[in-house]
Amino acid sequence: MARTFILWLHGLGDSGPANEPIQTQFKSSELSNASWLFPSAPFNPVTCNNGAVMRSWFDVPELPFKVGSPIDESSVLEAVKNVHAIIDQEIAEGTNPENVFICGLSQGGALTLASVLLYPKTLGGGAVLSGWVPFTSSIISQFPEEAKKTPILWSHGTDDRMVLFEAGQAALPFLKEAGVTCEFKAYPGLGHSISNKELKYIESWIKRRLKGSSSTCLQLNCLKEMFH
């Protein structure tokens, strides 16, 4: 049976274990035995919070994040290396790359986008929830051709005051320039959070993209901590 792997990347200051209940919202039989991983970011000083130390995948110079907010690309690229190591391990264990899905909220969404677009193989998809583009367009030339074939699902609440809706919309011209397919879904009235409606759509989106058997095998019950 085909194996499916779902990697979920949390937001700034959050943790992997706190996000594990999300898995229970995915109730379809096609994903009943999917392998999930909810890693926790390391503790780092964060510029937008006056240098306070918290779980953070990379440095964030400014929040709320809006169109034109400064970014720290070098910090993002370091975080991407660690996500790629997890994906590499999963593929080495036999998972079809096109059954590997990366999902992330806020800062985790930005890291999801970066990790997918810089990975040398086509993955099943990247789901960005209330995230942003953590790059300037100068990096587009570094995207592998296979990575550009990975579909992106972008979900964003119109009332988001932490990562402004307009910052999410700015992903569309960026991805178009890169030649990447993106489905953008706006959620009217939703702030900087996740809704059950979003999760249900992500579930159906993943199901439509599964390769091979509709069933999955390999259950990972352990939680791995990244970057330690």
From Swiss-Prot:
Changing residue 192 to A: Loss of catalytic activity. The keyword Hydrolase applies. Its EC number is 3.1.1.-. The active site is at 106 (charge relay system), 160 (charge relay system), 192 (charge relay system). It comes from the Eukaryota. It holds the Pfam family Abhydrolase_2. The keyword Oxidoreductase does not apply. Possesses carboxylesterase activity in vitro with a preference for short acyl chain substrates. Functions as a negative regulator of the hypersensitive response (HR) triggered by the bacterial type III effector protein AvrBsT. Possesses phospholipase A2 (PLA2) activity and hydrolyzes phosphatidylcholine (PC), a lipid that is hydrolyzed by phospholipase D (PLD) to produce phosphatidic acid (PA). Required to suppress AvrBsT-dependent HR and PLD-dependent production of PA in response to AvrBsT elicitation. Keywords: Fatty acid metabolism, Hydrolase, Lipid metabolism, Plant defense. One of its GO terms (molecular function) is short-chain carboxylesterase activity. This is Carboxylesterase SOBER1. It is an enzyme of class 3 (hydrolase).
